[in-house]
Amino acid sequence: MTQFASPVLHSLLDTDAYKLHMQQAVFHHYYDVHVAAEFRCRGDDLLGIYADAIREQVNAMQHLQLQEDEFQWLSGLPFFKADYLNWLRDFRYNPEQVCVTNDNGKLNIRLTGPWREVIMWEVPLLAVISELVHRYRSPEMGVAQALDALESKLVDFSALTADLNMSRFHLMDFGTRRRFSREVQQAIVKRLQQEPWFVGTSNYDLARRLSLTPMGTQAHEWFQAHQQISPDLATSQRAALAAWLNEYPNQLGIALTDCITMDAFLRDFGTEFATRYQGLRHDSGDPVEWGEKAIAHYQKLGIDPLSKTLVFSDNLDLKKAVDLYRHFSSRVQLSFGIGTRLTCDIPQVKPLNIVIKLVECNGKPVAKLSDSPGKTICHDKAFVRALRKAFDLPHIKKAS
C-alpha cells in the first residue's frame, strides 16, 4: 500500500468539459471505433517511481459513477441528449484499459479500448499523476501558498490593466490536468469568481458545484482520429469539422486549429465552416502571428472578425493574456484559458509538463503536427510524411 491510499478523485465529472462533449459525439457517430493513447512527459522528470501509486489510483477510478444530482444537472444543459446521458449513467472506468509501467525510471502509460471509453481517461489520469507527484515532492505546500501566490499576481494584474477597458476581457480556468491538487484548483477558482472578468471553468465538477459556466469544445484527438476514420487523408480535417457541426450545429462552436498546423487548417476552413463556427482556439505557435492569420482569414472571407471569438490557451499566464488583449481587443472577441499558471503556480513547486495523446485509431497511426515542433507526436514516420504530403506541408521537423 502506498503512502496515499485514499482516492484522489471523487467525481466522474472531475474532468474537462470537452471530454464529455467529444464523448457524446463519439457515442453517436463512432461507437465502435477503437483507439490507443500514450502518456508523455515533455520535461526531464523521471516519474516511473510513482507507477505503483498511479496504478492504485487507476484501480480506484472504477468505483466512480455519475450521481443522480450530477445526472440531473447535465440534463439541464442544452447540448446533451438523453440517450448519451443514460449511457453515461452506467459508464464505469475499466482499469484493464490502462497499462502503467516503470521503464528504468521513465513512466510509461498506454491506454487501449473503445474510443467512447478511452476518451475519459486522459484528464483525470493526468490530474492524478500531477497530484500524486506534488504530494510526494511538496507535502508542506497547498491551498494557502497557492492563494498567496494568486493574490500577488492579481495585484500585478491590476497594475497592468489600469489603463485598459477590461469589459471584453474573459478568463477561464483550464487547469484541471496539471493542477497541484483538487483542493488548490477549487480554491483558485473560488477566488477568481470574485473578479468580473472570470467567466467559467473547463472542469465540469467545479462548474456544477460553484454554479459556473462549463467551458470547452473539442481537443486534438477529435481531428487525429478522423485521419483514420475518414476514407481520404487529405479531407480528414474537413470531415472532423463537419462531423462536429453534425453533433453540435448551434453550440460548442470553437474549433481547434493546430492538429495539422494553422496554415493547413485555414485552407480547410472555408466560408461555410468560418460562418457556422463561432471562433477558433490557439494552442501552439506564436499567438500574435496566429491571431493575425485568423483575423485576415475572416476578412478575406467577408466575415467581420468582431462577430467571432479567438480563444488563447497555450501556456498562458495573466501577463501574456493582457498583452494579447491589448493587441487584439479592438478587432475580435477574445477569451483566455489559463491552466498550469493558475492551478500549479506555487513558489518552489515545479509543475509537470505532461500529456496523454492519441497514437492509433482502429489499429492505424494518427499524428499531431502542431505549430510548435516539440509538440509533434507520432510513432510512424511514414505516416507523418503521408500526412504532411496530404496537407501540403513543408519538410518535417523531427517528430518526438
Swiss-Prot record:
It is an enzyme of class 6 (ligase). One of its GO terms (cellular component) is cytosol. Keywords: Ligase, Phosphoprotein, Pyridine nucleotide biosynthesis. Its EC number is 6.3.4.21. CDD domains: PncB_like. It catalyses: nicotinate + 5-phospho-alpha-D-ribose 1-diphosphate + ATP + H2O = nicotinate beta-D-ribonucleotide + ADP + phosphate + diphosphate. Transiently phosphorylated on a His residue during the reaction cycle. Phosphorylation strongly increases the affinity for substrates and increases the rate of nicotinate D-ribonucleotide production. Dephosphorylation regenerates the low-affinity form of the enzyme, leading to product release. The keyword Disulfide bond does not apply. It holds the Pfam family NAPRTase_N. InterPro entries: N/Namide_PRibTrfase, NAPRTase_N, Nic_PRibTrfase, Nic_PRibTrfase-Fam, Nicotinate_pribotase-like_C. Pathway: Cofactor biosynthesis; NAD(+) biosynthesis; nicotinate D-ribonucleotide from nicotinate: step 1/1. The modification Phosphohistidine is found at residue 220. GO terms for molecular function: nicotinate phosphoribosyltransferase activity. HAMAP family: NAPRTase. Catalyzes the synthesis of beta-nicotinate D-ribonucleotide from nicotinate and 5-phospho-D-ribose 1-phosphate at the expense of ATP. Belongs to the NAPRTase family. This is Nicotinate phosphoribosyltransferase. It comes from Citrobacter koseri (strain ATCC BAA-895 / CDC 4225-83 / SGSC4696). The gene is pncB.
